[in-house]
C-alpha cells in the first residue's frame, strides 16, 4: 500500500550543549511517500521523506535566530531521506519493528543512516517512529556556538511519521 506523509508528521532534534541540558527543536514540515506490505515489509518497504529546513521552533527566539544563520535555509531549503532497506523486521500484533537504513541528502552531502524504527501500516493510516544519532559535521552544519554555549556535534533525531493512503 502507498501512503502520503501527513501534516501531523514532525522531526525532533535533541541536542546537548556545554552548561546546558537537552534542547529540543521541532521541525514540523515534512512531505513524501511511504510504501509497504506489512506481511513482507523487508521486501516491499520504500520511502522518500523531505524535511523543510526553514520551518522550526526551539522555543527560544535567540536560538532560532542563531540556527537560521547556521542552517542557511535560503541556500539549503530541504533535507531528503530515501529508505534503502529494512532489516530484522519483527511483528507484534499490528506493530512492526526493525532497522531502517537509508541515505540522507543535505547541503550537497550524502550520509548513510541506520535507525531503530517501529510503526504500523493500516488501511486508513501508517505511523512510524525512527530514532538515530547524527554528527552535524557529516551534513556540513557547524555545531552552533553562542556566548558560553557550544552545542555538541552529535545530536539525536526522532522522526514521527503519520501518513494517509495515497490518492490514486
Residue ranges, per PLM feature:
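Low-complexity, acidic/polar, glycine-enriched regions of mature
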Residues: 1-168
Amino acid at each position: 500500500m502507498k501512503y502520503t506523509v501527513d501534516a501531523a508528521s514532525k522531526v525532533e532534534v535533541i541536542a546537548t550543549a556545554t552548561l546546558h541540558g537537552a534542547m529540543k527543536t521541532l521541525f514540523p514540515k515534512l512531505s513524501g511517500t511511504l510504501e509497504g506490505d506489512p506481511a513482507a515489509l523487508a521486501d516491499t518497504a520504500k520511502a522518500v521523506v523531505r524535511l523543510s529546513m526553514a520551518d522550526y521552533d526551539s522555543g527560544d527566539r535567540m536560538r532560532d535566530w542563531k540556527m537560521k544563520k547556521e542552517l542557511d535555509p535560503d541556500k539549503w531549503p530541504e533535507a531528503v531521506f530515501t529508505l534503502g532497506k529494512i532489516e530484522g523486521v519483527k511483528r507484534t500484533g499490528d506493530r512492526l519493528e526493525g532497522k531502517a537504513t537509508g541515505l540522507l541528502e543535505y547541503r550537497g552531502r550524502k550520509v548513510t543512516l541506520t535507525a531503530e524504527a517501529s510503526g504500523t501500516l493500516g488501511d486508513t493510516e501508517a505511523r512510524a517512529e525512527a530514532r538515530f544519532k547524527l554528527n552535524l559535521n557529516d551534513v556540513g552544519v557547524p555545531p552552533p556556538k553562542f556566548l558560553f554555549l557550544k552545542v555538541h556535534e552529535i545530536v539525536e533525531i526522532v522522526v514521527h511519521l503519520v501518513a494517509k493512503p495515497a490518492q490514486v
